[in-house]
């Protein structure tokens, strides 16, 4: 598949997605492929961009973004890394709440483009947001992934992850990296997830080499249309992970 230029991709996204706020976060508008979109039932060849996961508002991202918006004082003046940013909802929510500095990270450059378009859609200045497609889980990029956070102990720091736990092998890599960042910068790790197996079931949790505690901060009931769009998950939960 030939990959379109970013300019061509932006035009395609705007033309072929629906601007929607039908979610747990009606304050936020997003360019999405929803059940009301002609692309919903299309075959993959109808989309010139590979795997447009960034055009869907996944349950964990909805729950995490709702939690951020509901806890504005916690995120005001903070430093944020939105890991696996996708559509950018967590970054947008943090910006609305007054985060001081935001890094939207996704290895797919079209996801970062989607995040940027959604920032503009919500009339947010993106001067305080940085975009990076660096794979932070690659050992050679470890130093780069720690440079974003300041050394100040007076600034709250967060890594935000929505819907990242589909696979236990990937989760193991992710936990190892998160522990390094948390140890180095006293970063809080917040996760939005609808209880997918790698983060929910004890047989997986006991097997991971990197040990952590999982504290549930919130649980949100998903609207019926979200349940229908996302494989029957009924709720989205927000957890804080503390590594040992």
UniProtKB/Swiss-Prot annotation:
Domain of life, per lineage: Eukaryota
The EC number(s) this enzyme carries: 2.1.1.-
Gene Ontology cellular component annotations, sorted alphabetically: mitochondrial matrix
Keyword terms of this UniProt record: Methyltransferase, Transferase
InterPro entries the UniProt entry points to: Ribosomal_L11_MeTrfase_PrmA, SAM-dependent_MTases_sf
Transferase listed as a keyword: yes
Any single biological process term in GO: negative regulation of fatty acid beta-oxidation using acyl-CoA dehydrogenase
Gene Ontology molecular functions: protein-lysine N-methyltransferase activity
Signal peptide positions (record): none
Function as written in the Swiss-Prot or TrEMBL entry: Probable methyltransferase.
Family under the similarity heading: Belongs to the methyltransferase superfamily. ETFBKMT family.
The protein, known as: Electron transfer flavoprotein beta subunit lysine methyltransferase homolog
